[in-house]
């Protein structure tokens, strides 16, 4: 049954989509069957700065796949869409943690933003937004480096048009600590903003906005 539709439309009639492979560049999850099937999860990325793979979307009935996690400093992948008739949206992936700074004035890397939560169709709950990654710590040396900023938490997906709760908002990543120096210290990284909760359908609960994360700390100068 799946062979003709796979050939013509590049998508099976029924069945779950395959999970995306993890690696230097995380691959997107496959879409679920046109009539029934869940979307595959996105793959996690490992190469610095690369976003995670997006979650696959469902067809008529099924849940969206989860977005893959970002590599260091990379954004999380977006969650897949829930089924047009019935199904929940996929959760967004988590942003990667920023790299730590090295040596004099070595600034920490910024954390990656979370992935968007997938929305539902007619009936179903929205996917949760991904959390932002923490910022990297500043390097230590003659002059300390600044900590990296935390990534932004992402929006939760909208609930189904008829019934469904909005997806929970992603939390922002914590700012990185400042590096210590003999002559001067670096600045602490800012915490990332929290995402907004997803809208509800005709019947359902809208989620609140997530709170912002904490700023990094500044340690005592070593001079």
Which role fits each region the language model picked out?
Residues 17-223:
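Collagen triple-helix signature
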Residues 1-10, 14-17, 21:
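Amphipathic alpha-helical hairpins/coiled-coils and adjacent low-complexity
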């Amino acid at each position: 049954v799946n062979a003709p539709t796979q050939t013509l439309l590049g998508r099976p009639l029924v069945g779950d989509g395959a999970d995306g492979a993890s690696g230097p560049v995380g691959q997107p999850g496959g879409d679920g069957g046109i009539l029934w099937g869940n979307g595959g999860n996105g793959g996690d990325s490992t190469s610095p700065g690369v976003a995670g793979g997006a979650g696959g979307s469902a067809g008529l009935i099924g849940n969206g796949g989860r977005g893959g996690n970002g590599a260091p400093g990379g954004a999380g992948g977006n969650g897949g869409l829930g089924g047009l008739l019935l199904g929940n949206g996929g959760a967004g992936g988590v942003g990667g943690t920023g790299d730590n700074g090295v040596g004099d004035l070595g600034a920490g890397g910024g954390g990656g933003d979370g992935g968007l939560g997938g929305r539902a169709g007619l009936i179903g709950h929205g996917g949760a937004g991904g959390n932002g990654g923490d910022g990297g710590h500043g390097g230590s040396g003659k002059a300390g480096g600044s900590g990296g900023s935390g990534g932004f938490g992402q929006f939760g997906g909208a609930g189904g048009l008829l019934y469904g709760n909005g997806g929970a908002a992603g939390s922002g990543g914590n700012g990185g600590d400042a590096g210590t120096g003999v002559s001067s210290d670096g600045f602490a990284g800012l915490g990332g903003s929290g995402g907004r909760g997803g809208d509800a359908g005709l019947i359902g609960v809208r989620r609140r906005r997530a709170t912002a994360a904490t700023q990094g700390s500044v340690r005592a100068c070593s001079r």
